[in-house]
Amino acid sequence: MWQLLLPTALLLLVSAGMRAEDLPKAVVFLEPQWYRVLEKDSVTLKCQGAYSPEDNSTRWFHNESLISSQTSSYFIAAARVNNSGEYRCQTSLSTLSDPVQLEVHIGWLLLQAPRWVFKEEDSIHLRCHSWKNTLLHKVTYLQNGKGRKYFHQNSDFYIPKATLKDSGSYFCRGLIGSKNVSSETVNITITQDLAVSSISSFFPPGYQVSFCLVMVLLFAVDTGLYFSVKKSIPSSTSDWKDHKFKWSKDPQDK
């Protein structure tokens, strides 16, 4: 059902001679950016897509079922577990968006991040979120069971440039009043750039710079040879054309 285009969009497509696959795809954004939230949190989903002058409505889908909302923003005032699932949107001049996942959890604490898979040197932003934003203090972020960062008052934890050593299981804990509470554990994965990885596997770290320099020098020499040969070809051709041959009979043919 959600795969059907808006009736108005169909008319516009026919009149303009366009096909559905020619339209841009709509995009769903979360505000705030966290796709894992606690019950009672407020969540706003925004749809970015093209609209026709005649139809500025938006179609929202939750787990492939049409939602009654027709505005560009879909607001959840107090999230519940049954709000979890995939959300998509579509406008009159855009195709159905890719799904965005929303997870609603029950608990005192939740470790949040925009995503759980990062590349080397990406920045990582972690947030230890308490239910209904209850005051939280003496907060510790832990990696693989060991304390990674401590804050007397609750604060977000930033890793400016991720390395492979930052991969692992993470959770946070702290005090709400005198009650010691912890979040569920989540796994963070840091991936290595394939190009860097392939060079590193061939050469030890001490030789990688030398290898790059050799490649640059080989390229420079190869380029110089190319232009040198290219420059000499026209003159050689010209000399060949200007050269005159004289034929003489062999003495015995006389």
UniProtKB/Swiss-Prot annotation:
Gene name per UniProt: FCGR3A
- Which residues does the UniProt site feature Cleavage point to? A195, V196
Ranges for region Disordered: 234-254
Skewed-composition ranges (Basic and acidic residues): 239-254
Q: Where in the cell is it found?
A: Cell membrane; Secreted
Classification via Pfam families: Ig_2 (PF13895)
What's its membrane topology?
A: Single-pass type I membrane protein
User: Known Gene3D superfamilies for this protein?
Assistant: Immunoglobulins (2.60.40.10)
Signal peptide residue numbers: 1-20
* One GO biological process term: natural killer cell activation
Give the multimer and partner information.
Answer: Forms a heterooligomeric complex with ITAM-containing signaling subunits, either a homodimer of CD247, a homodimer of FCER1G or a heterodimer of CD247 and FCER1G, to form a functional receptor complex. Interacts (via transmembrane domain) with signaling subunits; this interaction is a prerequisite for receptor complex expression on the cell surface and intracellular signal transduction. Binds the Fc region of antigen-complexed IgG with a preference for IgG1 and IgG3 isotypes. Interacts with CD2; this interaction is involved in NK cell activation and cytotoxicity.
Marked site positions, Important for receptor turnover: D222
On tissue specificity, the annotation reads:
Lymphocytes and monocytes.
InterPro entries in UniProt: Ig-like_dom, Ig-like_dom_sf, Ig-like_fold, Ig_Fc_receptor, Ig_sub
The organism is: Papio anubis
Q: Which UniProt keywords apply?
A: Cell membrane, Disulfide bond, Glycoprotein, IgG-binding protein, Immunity, Immunoglobulin domain, Membrane, Receptor, Repeat, Secreted, Signal, Transmembrane, Transmembrane helix
- Which named protein is this? Low affinity immunoglobulin gamma Fc region receptor III-A
Q: Which residues are glycosylated?
A: N187
Q: Which GO terms describe its cellular component?
A: external side of plasma membrane; extracellular space; plasma membrane
